[in-house]
């Protein structure tokens, strides 16, 4: 049985801008997001603006691609949604992006259920 999850990507002041559904989020940990941010940093280079850690929808799109590429057939269980409300999810994460370009990864929290 999979553990469904949602990941909300918000602006620095908490406004929802993009959301992702992950069918198998049971194995997600803070290290999962650290690995994702490290991949973005490695692949996008050292210029903070290019990392887009301040751009929720851009970062959400990269997260979908990263999820789809990290495990065999993982692309079958990840997708873009309008928001976490109304989705039956066992786990809900929020990625709060920065106000301005930064090389520091965004803050990730797991919402209490």
Model-flagged regions — what are they?
Residues 1-26:
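Short, extreme N-terminal segment that most often corresponds to the first beta-strand
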Residues 9, 27-31, 43:
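Catalytic phosphate/metal-binding cores of nucleic-acid and nucleotide-processing enzymes, i.e., regions
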Residues 39-113:
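Low-complexity intrinsically disordered segments
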Residues 34-36:
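A cross-kingdom marker of C-terminal helix-rich interaction/assembly modules
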């Amino acid at each position: 049985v999979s553990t469904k999850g949602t990941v909300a990507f918000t602006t620095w002041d908490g406004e929802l801008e993009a959301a992702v559904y992950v069918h198998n989020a049971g194995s997600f940990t803070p290290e999962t997001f650290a690995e994702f941010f490290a991949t973005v940093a490695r692949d996008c280079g050292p210029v903070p603006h290019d990392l887009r850690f301040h751009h929720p929808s851009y970062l959400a799109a990269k997260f979908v691609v990263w999820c789809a590429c990290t495990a065999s057939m993982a692309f079958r269980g990840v997708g873009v949604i309008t928001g976490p409300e109304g989705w039956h999810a066992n786990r809900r994460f929020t990625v709060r992006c920065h106000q301005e370009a930064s090389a520091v990864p965004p803050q990730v929290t797991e919402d209490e259920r």
